[in-house]
Amino acid sequence: MEYVAAYVMFDKVGKELNERSMTELFNEIGAEIEPETMRLFLSKVSGKSMDEVMSKGKELMASLAISSSQKSEPAQPADTAESTQATENKEEEDEDFDIFAAF
């Protein structure tokens, strides 16, 4: 979240956001940087306007809201192995979610 906040701050003041400027900002405020995460974030937003990033974020959030608001069907008696496999598949899908992939 701190990388997103830095992105917004740099955009609002019209400064270029890059690895050096973000590192300087984080050092100035005493925040820790995870270099790999920062580089991944910068690679995903590089060359994109704030409007593009916000629009893509809204689309992503809307799709999450739809999938989480869907009601599940009442439980039906089923083979235990099948229901266990379905639960494991759902958990794997949740683990694979990557917010940076949206950009």
UniProtKB/Swiss-Prot annotation:
- Origin species, per record, is Encephalitozoon cuniculi (strain GB-M1) (Microsporidian parasite)
HAMAP family xref list: Ribosomal_L12_arch (MF_01478)
Task: Tell me where it resides.
Answer: Cytoplasm
Q: Does the keyword Cytoplasm apply?
A: yes
Q: What does this protein do?
A: Plays an important role in the elongation step of protein synthesis.
Which residues fall in a compositionally biased region of kind Acidic residues? 90-103
Its Gene Ontology biological processes?
cytoplasmic translational elongation
What does the UniProt keyword field contain? Answer: Cytoplasm, Ribonucleoprotein, Ribosomal protein
What is the protein's quaternary organization? Answer: Component of the large ribosomal subunit.
Query: Per the similarity annotation, which family is this?
Result: Belongs to the eukaryotic ribosomal protein P1/P2 family.
Q: Please state the gene responsible for encoding this protein.
A: RPP2A
Would I find Ribosomal protein among this entry's keywords? yes
Predominant location:
cytoplasm
What Gene Ontology cellular-component terms does the record carry?
cytosolic large ribosomal subunit
One annotated GO molecular function is: structural constituent of ribosome
Q: Where is this region: Disordered?
A: 64-103
Protein name as it appears in the record: Large ribosomal subunit protein P2
